[in-house]
Amino acid sequence: MDKKPLDTLISATGLWMSRTGMIHKIKHHEVSRSKIYIEMACGERLVVNNSRSSRTARALRHHKYRKTCRHCRVSDEDINNFLTKTSEEKTTVKVKVVSAPRVRKAMPKSVARAPKPLEATAQVPLSGSKPAPATPVSAPAQAPAPSTGSASATSASAQRMANSAAAPAAPVPTSAPALTKGQLDRLEGLLSPKDEISLDSEKPFRELESELLSRRKKDLKRIYAEERENYLGKLEREITKFFVDRGFLEIKSPILIPAEYVERMGINSDTELSKQVFRIDKNFCLRPMLAPNLYNYLRKLDRALPDPIKIFEIGPCYRKESDGKEHLEEFTMLNFCQMGSGCTRENLEAIITEFLNHLGIDFEIIGDSCMVYGNTLDVMHDDLELSSAVVGPVPLDREWGIDKPWIGAGFGLERLLKVMHGFKNIKRAARSESYYNGISTNL
């Protein structure tokens, strides 16, 4: 049987055992990546490693103790539950009832292949037997002879039919062949949100492609002559000015971070997010988020800067995503946070509202939860998540030496651009050689 870690044991018993073998009743405990923060009923507090092989873990597994804490008032029921060795793992078998589909009865091949008897087939007498008398069949009633007028009308109608058959048929217009999937993908890549061209039209592929190529070349020439700004870079500069003007300090932290930072964020090897980390070697990886470096900045700047501390960072992050319409493996994040006074949900929502109104984006804020921070506030545009926001403190803060209240949120810049410019695919807003400002460069 696998040795259960300490947090599992104390959660099951609700008890703690000291080095002297004294049992305490646990009033409250919190578990981080490697630590357990415990508060006893008697008021004693301690921080211990979440170990499988510590003395306390062994004692709890073996159900042995010497005495109880008189201030914790450990009940007899707690003691009995602790001493009773019951199996912690119970297996249940779920039976799913499935109705069998209706199956037609099988028919022998010889019968299935036999021709069906014709209803009007004449009966052939067998040799040596008398022929059966024929059943008299009544002759069909003879149609009355047409009158002279009707006969001439029939003759004229037949003449017209003969003349029409002799005349050559008018040519039938042929429609353009249906577009293949590859052709549709090519045309969709050339389309822009401003185009009013239907791919269901009867125009041939070459004609549609030629028209779209001409439009995209004109778009690139216009950008080169007038704007000369990349959407992503322009948005970064606009966001930087927004937060600097509101008293936030701009941060530029390393992209290559220790792998230990990821583990301290609660992303262990058995989590799904751990599989998405780009690892350089066993010691370093590309940052999947901005939070670890910002945690370190908050702790260090707290020694020098006045209250409250307000910082933000814009930079690339990397994850092995599905790379679909809403995810990228290389993406640009904005994280802003404030630590100290004024760190309330109302102030956080006020900053988010002012920021998105500045960009002209409609949104709504709803409650949610995530693996790293627990309870979060999700900022949504229709069914697209723009941001996850947090009101601290959270248990994870202790791993980074943070013991003050804080608020913060993270936005993906490519998602903001997707909404601002009406892109159907997030790749049009990303760092790419295939698109510039959402315009295909494969011309």
Curated annotation (Swiss-Prot):
Q: Where is the composition biased (Low complexity)?
A: 131-177
**Official protein name in the record:** Pyrrolysine--tRNA ligase
Q: Where in the cell is it found?
A: Cytoplasm
GO function term, MF aspect, one? pyrrolysyl-tRNA synthetase activity
Q: Coiled coil located at which positions?
A: none
Q: Which reaction does it catalyse?
A: tRNA(Pyl) + L-pyrrolysine + ATP = L-pyrrolysyl-tRNA(Pyl) + AMP + diphosphate
Q: Which PROSITE patterns match?
A: AA_TRNA_LIGASE_II (PS50862)
EC number annotated for this UniProt entry: 6.1.1.26
- Keyword Disulfide bond assigned: no
Of the GO CC terms on this record, one is: cytoplasm
EC class (word): ligase
- InterPro entries of this UniProt entry? aa-tRNA-synth_II (IPR006195), aa-tRNA-synth_II/BPL/LPL (IPR045864), Phenylalanyl-tRNA_Synthase (IPR002319), Pyrrolysyl-tRNA_ligase (IPR012739), Pyrrolysyl-tRNA_ligase_C (IPR023877), Pyrrolysyl-tRNA_ligase_N (IPR023878)
What species was this sequence derived from?
Methanosarcina acetivorans (strain ATCC 35395 / DSM 2834 / JCM 12185 / C2A)
Keywords carried by this UniProt record? Aminoacyl-tRNA synthetase, ATP-binding, Cytoplasm, Ligase, Nucleotide-binding, Protein biosynthesis
Tell me the GO BP annotations in alphabetical order: asparaginyl-tRNA aminoacylation
Q: Give the Pfam families listed for this entry.
A: tRNA-synt_2d
* The keyword Ligase belongs to this UniProt entry's keyword annotation: yes
Please give the start and end residues of each transmembrane region: none
